[in-house]
């Protein structure tokens, strides 16, 4: 007697989503499993399928940035905040692969690169391994990781101009204990752009920031990467910002 068996797949405990989780597929190695809110219809399903197809590229890029091998993650594509253009952002519960591996990303109909970028933003935070979480430093690093793996698909999320328009306050020698302030995040975005323009790689920056941990500032990062006195970071950066011919009008003003 034969009987067809349907494998039961437990629904992940999403941080915010409470609707139906439609299974879309998993990568061959089982590292990434993708779901979608069926209410999104064909455009949402297309987003999820395109994310699944791109997932291993994103994971490989993220692993290279942090010099580590990440863990398995679940992702659901849905309309965060009711948005279907990616502007709802992304979310997860923690900056690790144990309790933060259920990731929510906003649908972006017709713009798969935006969905992949949102995935990387959260995946990078998992790779920070409980460091930099909820801080301006970690938020800037997360956004740079997303930008670097998606050809800046989230350009409209730029915060460095907010920093410039608010008097360019110093968040190089101090850390803002929030990831919700566009001014402090923007300072970090511009500072990382500056370090990249000096020849340092995003991998060097990311790995040193994780090593420095929550107490690390961008000034201490500068000191570790250059061998120079960390006290020189802010004045040198500030002088170079002042000398920018076009000012700060993107997250990569030195690029």
Where are these regions (language model features)?
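Zn2+-dependent metallopeptidase catalytic core
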Residues: 1-123, 127-134, 138, 145, ...
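Active-site-proximal structural scaffolding
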Residues: 55, 135-138, 184-188, 214, ...
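Structural helix-adjacent loops and short alpha-helical linkers that scaffold large soluble proteins
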Residues: 64, 69-72, 150-158, 196-204
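Secretory-pathway/luminal and periplasmic proteins that interact with or process carbohydrate-rich
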Residues: 83-89, 149-155, 215-219
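Post-HExxH zinc-binding segment in Zn-dependent metallohydrolases
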Residues: 131-182
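Active-site rim elements
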Residues: 172-182, 193, 206-208, 222
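Contiguous mid-protein beta-loop-alpha structural module that forms a pocket-lining wall or clamp
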Residues: 184-217
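Beta/coil-rich, acidic/histidine-enriched accessory regions frequently appended to metallopeptidases
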Residues: 214-255
């Amino acid at each position: 007697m034969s009987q067809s068996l349907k494998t039961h797949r437990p629904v992940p405990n999403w941080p915010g989503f409470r609707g139906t989780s439609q299974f879309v597929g998993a990568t061959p190695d089982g590292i990434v499993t993708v779901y979608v809110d069926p209410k999104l219809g064909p455009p949402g399903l297309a987003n999820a399928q395109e994310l699944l197809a791109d997932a291993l590229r994103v994971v490989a890029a993220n692993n290279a940035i942090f010099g580590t091998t990440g863990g398995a993650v679940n992702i659901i594509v849905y309309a965060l905040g009711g948005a279907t253009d990616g502007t709802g952002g992304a979310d997860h519960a923690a900056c690790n692969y144990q309790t933060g591996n259920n990731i929510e990303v906003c649908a972006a109909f017709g713009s798969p690169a935006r969905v992949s970028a949102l995935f990387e933003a959260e995946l990078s935070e998992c790779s920070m391994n409980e460091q930099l979480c909820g801080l301006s430093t970690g938020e800037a690093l997360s956004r740079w990781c997303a930008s670097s793996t998606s050809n800046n698909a989230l350009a409209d999320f730029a915060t460095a101009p907010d920093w410039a328009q608010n008097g360019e306050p110093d968040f190089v020698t101090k850390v803002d204990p929030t990831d919700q302030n566009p001014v402090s995040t923007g300072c970090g975005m511009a500072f990382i752009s500056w370090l990249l323009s000096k020849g340092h790689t995003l991998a060097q920056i990311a790995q040193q920031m994780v090593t420095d941990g929550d107490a690390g500032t961008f000034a201490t990062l500068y000191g570790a990467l250059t061998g120079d006195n960390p006290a020189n970071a802010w004045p040198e950066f500030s002088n170079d910002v002042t000398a920018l011919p076009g000012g700060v009008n993107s997250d990569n003003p030195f690029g």
